[in-house]
Amino acid sequence: MDIVEKAQMFAAGAHAGVGQKRKYTGEDYIHHPVAVAEIVRRSGGTDEMIAAAMLHDTIEDTQVTFDHIFNLFGDRVAEMVDALSNKAQPEDGNREARFFINVRALRERLDMQSRVIKLADLIHNTESITRHDQKFAAQYLAEKAFMLRVLFADAEIGVSDEEIESRPGAHPLLIEAEKIVATALAQLPEELFYKSDRINAALTEKWGSMQ
């Protein structure tokens, strides 16, 4: 069994073990990390990156710890999964406060390879949320548009230095993510579009005051 198969089996068991289902559809949660891993695979990701994509929500959402990932999959996979895991806790404040805690942690911890996984995660989540919950999408899309600017603008994204140096322009997944978010925003009813725009502006202003 290779590392990707092992990661998929482990993640499926971890998410099932806490009864986690995919929001809106009720399908087994593993469908999401499998979809994220497939996006990473088609983007040329290494086996370790694909395994980390399979595992990216295990520390955050299940009983799995960093040490479990480290012992079973090695330091590189564990490092990426940890970097991708939200750090904010419910007691850290309201949604905005927790959002900024997570953004700051992602900005500090993501590297070129884990940024690929984060973009894949954003793409798959955006497609699901805009399909099933337009009201929440106004909030969600504002946050993702903000994250695309803060986490990925001018950042290194890719499998290796060689790939980045040989690639003209932005990483294809960044282009895809920006297009998906922009298209989803354009498809919102006018009232929700302007609500999302106001949220984005407020996040940008608050972030600027925190720097």
PLM regions: where:
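Active-site helical microenvironments for divalent-metal-assisted chemistry
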Residues: 1-211
